[in-house]
């Protein structure tokens, strides 16, 4: 692991449960000398990623708020999702439409829109969720590269077995292949009681998994309505987002001299 990776890894320590850290506590947690921990914290503060809060404590810094605003306004996935979900929402009835993307060995809810509903779902924006449970997560998992799936199985075999995805590598691989072959994935009360979910994959311009689009709705709707018709709407939305993301060509780098 490079020194940059170790320094940025410090940010993972900050959470709702532990929003403030001292240099000494960070050094102890990450196995760093005090001088190294101090240097990392100093550099992160300089970049605006951390900020002092008094008493020797540090919290996440204002640069993160700035980056969040930029992501909300111009991120290709969120821009495409906003336009698509706005059109889709009146057609799906009671429930919540949300987008999740992979982050490390978890998934992160990054955007949602909702019709009036009584649901209480775990996928609130910015909250990491398990990779092996819930259709929004598993549909992403199924499309990850095989090399990454092998590593995930080595490191999380017990969790994978508990989630019903296979008791050995072959069974795990075959389960994901079967999921990958389907146009959508459903889940009933897998994370939240009373919630039925329909998820479809979203891909980037190169055909790699980028995110999932999910409709979460009251479980009773799945017992009374045509799930396939609702799934067609989710698939339509996922395809539209995929196409919109692919249409946004990367910017050509600007030569340093031309920026003066």
Task: Locate the predicted segments by residue.
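Juxtadomain coupling helices with adjacent low-complexity linkers
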Residues: 169-171, 182, 193-194, 211-260
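Amphipathic alpha-helical effector-binding/dimerization core
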Residues: 60-155
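Sensor-regulatory modules in signal-transduction proteins
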Residues: 202-205
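Short, basic/aromatic recognition patches
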Residues: 81-88, 153-199, 244
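N-terminal helix-turn-helix
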Residues: 1-74, 78-79, 239-247
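Short, structured helix-loop boundary elements
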Residues: 1-4, 61, 74, 78, ...
């Amino acid at each position: 692991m490079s020194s940059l990776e170790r320094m940025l890894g410090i940010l993972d320590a900050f959470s709702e449960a532990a929003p403030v850290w001292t240099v000494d506590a960070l050094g102890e947690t990450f196995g760093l000398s005090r001088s190294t921990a101090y240097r990392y914290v100093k550099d992160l503060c300089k970049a605006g990623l951390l900020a002092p809060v008094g008493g020797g404590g540090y919290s996440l810094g204002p640069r993160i708020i700035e980056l969040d605003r930029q992501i909300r306004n111009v991120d290709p996935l969120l821009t495409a999702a906003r336009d698509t979900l706005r059109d889709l929402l009146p057609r799906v009835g009671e429930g919540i439409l949300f987008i999740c993307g992979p982050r490390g060995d978890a998934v992160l809810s990054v955007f949602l829109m909702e019709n009036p509903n009584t649901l209480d779902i775990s996928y609130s924006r910015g909250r990491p969720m398990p990779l092996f449970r819930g259709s929004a997560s598993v549909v992403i998992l199924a499309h990850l590269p095989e090399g990454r799936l092998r590593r995930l199985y080595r490191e999380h075999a017990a969790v994978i077995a508990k989630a019903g995805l296979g008791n050995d590598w072959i069974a795990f691989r075959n389960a994901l292949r079967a999921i990958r072959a389907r146009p959508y994935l459903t889940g009933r009360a897998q994370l939240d009681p009373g919630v039925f979910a329909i998820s479809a994959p979203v891909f980037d311009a190169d055909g790699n998994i980028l995110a999932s689009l999910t409709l979460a709705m009251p479980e009773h709707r799945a017992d009374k309505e045509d799930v396939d018709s609702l799934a067609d709407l989710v698939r339509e939305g996922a395809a539209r987002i995929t196409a919109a993301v692919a249409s946004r060509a990367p910017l050509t780098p600007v030569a340093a001299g031309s920026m003066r």
